[in-house]
Amino acid sequence: MVKIRPDEISSIIKQQIEQYQQEVKAVNVGTVFQVGDGIARIYGLDKVMAGELVEFEDGTVGIALNLEAKNVGAVLMGEGTRVQEGSSVRATGKIAQIPVGDGYLGRVVNSLARPIDGKGEIATKENRLIESPAPGIISRRSVHEPLQTGIVAIDAMIPIGRGQRELIIGDRQTGKTAIAVDTILNQKGKDVVCVYVAIGQKASSIAQVVNTLQERGAMDYTIIVAATADSPATLQYLSPYTGAALAEYFMYTGRHTLVIYDDLTKQAQAYREMSLLLRRPPGREAYPGDVFYLHSRLLERAAKLNDKLGSGSMTALPVVETQEGDVSAYIPTNVISITDGQIFLSADIFNAGIRPAINVGISVSRVGSAAQPKAMKQVAGKLKLELAQFAELEAFSQFASDLDQATQNQLARGQRLRELLKQSQSSPLSLEDQVASIYAGTNGYLDVLPADRVRAFLVGLRQYLATNKAKYGEILRSTNALTDEAQTLLKEALKEYTEEFLASAK
């Protein structure tokens, strides 16, 4: 039997007393006195900061948004069904942040960057704040590199550059998401990381986008942030900032990124819902006074960084839905004034069978022309002019019965150019194919064809160039310009293929 020595016990107790350190930890705690509709009003929490995360007894997290004299209004980031009146809340001292890293590529995540695709956890090493300040003027460079969408009408007449913000605006069901998805598909092999943020959409629509991207091998360089229609308003409001934070990680490591916010109208509606429940005073269309700041602080994060910061870029394609083509509503006018141009999609053009249904007359790109490849500049100027003249003549010709030959020729050319701009969904075109199509249209090679055969001719021409004049494509890919040699090859191909096509049509 072991003998217990009293001196040993006393020395152990003495040692423990000497090593004891009293730590006083002050925790900022409050009490819920009202809860409902995803909003909690909290008494106490005197030292809470605006935008600080607060944690409820059941583990639900909220964001303190309203700091009033006697209480704090917090929005819940979750269902919050177990949050009750009288339960305690503590301030965490943190503001909303998410993990970021290369592990997110190919994954579908929610507004808090947690995976929802059933493929397991995502390994990350660093975190980023969901809301971080936009790069300053000194940190930026002017937009000078092209971002090709693969859509002829956009790349020729409304060009987009890396670091630009280009709005896609139009009524529902006019092909806004289709343009965004085609742009992602066209980034394959161009070392551009794409982030698609779905805000308030049906889960089935998001699944459709994921399937399209997977089938075409585009998920390898894409992250999808999904806040479905049944998500709480708080998560729909946060999702665009999460997408921007994920893209910023790549931008600040010198990579090029493309972020699509589909769509910001639903984010504004979610923010309006939160603000009205928080009893903030409503303004125009019942939106709160800071709804402009909601979008401006998001879109200003898109930038082309200077060489010192690694020359990375973030290009933003926000989508906004209009009602009956009303561009003068509150949210559309706000976002138009923030962005560097807009692509306007018209329901009338869509119903007339012209897809993509881009209204070239009122669509504009304010900075992208500086980034347009030289080859496209060489052929696009003439296309713009001829289409503008055609639109004017077409309106006039509806009232005139007999037209002279020159006018008839111009109308016929315009109809063929319009056919040239039609494009199937999920079939983006390379620069050399776009240049060949436009060159054929503006130089009269399509005038000899019936208008309904133009698209079939162009498909055949692209195949003919790839097999018989491969050097043409090589020159354009290496120089980005339509050199004399490339032009000669293109003319030869057009002459040879036109004869072949007309002979086969007989």
Swiss-Prot record:
Predominant cellular place of this UniProt entry's protein = plastid
Which residues make up the annotated site Required for activity? Answer: S363
Could you tell me which NCBIfam families the record lists for this protein? atpA, PRK13343.1
Family annotation (PROSITE patterns):
ATPASE_ALPHA_BETA
Ordered alphabetically, the record's keywords are: ATP synthesis, ATP-binding, CF(1), Chloroplast, Hydrogen ion transport, Ion transport, Membrane, Nucleotide-binding, Plastid, Thylakoid, Translocase, Transport
Where, per UniProt, does this protein localize?
A: Plastid, Chloroplast thylakoid membrane
Q: Which domain of life is it from?
A: Eukaryota
The membrane topology of this protein is:
Peripheral membrane protein
Q: Which organism is it from?
A: Chlorella vulgaris (Green alga)
State the reactions this protein catalyses: ATP + H2O + 4 H(+)(in) = ADP + phosphate + 5 H(+)(out)
Q: Where is ATP bound in this sequence?
A: G170, D171, R172, Q173, T174, G175, K176, T177
Q: Which residue pairs form cystines in this protein?
A: none
Could you tell me what this protein is called?
ATP synthase subunit alpha, chloroplastic
Task: Please tell me which top-level EC class this enzyme sits in.
Answer: translocase
**Gene behind this chain?**
atpA
- A molecular function GO annotation: proton-transporting ATP synthase activity, rotational mechanism
Q: What does this protein do?
A: Produces ATP from ADP in the presence of a proton gradient across the membrane. The alpha chain is a regulatory subunit.
Family to which the UniProt record says this protein belongs: Belongs to the ATPase alpha/beta chains family.
Any GO CC annotation of this UniProt entry: chloroplast thylakoid membrane
Q: Provide the E.C. number(s) assigned to this enzyme.
A: 7.1.2.2
**Oligomer and partners:** F-type ATPases have 2 components, CF(1) - the catalytic core - and CF(0) - the membrane proton channel. CF(1) has five subunits: alpha(3), beta(3), gamma(1), delta(1), epsilon(1). CF(0) has four main subunits: a, b, b' and c.
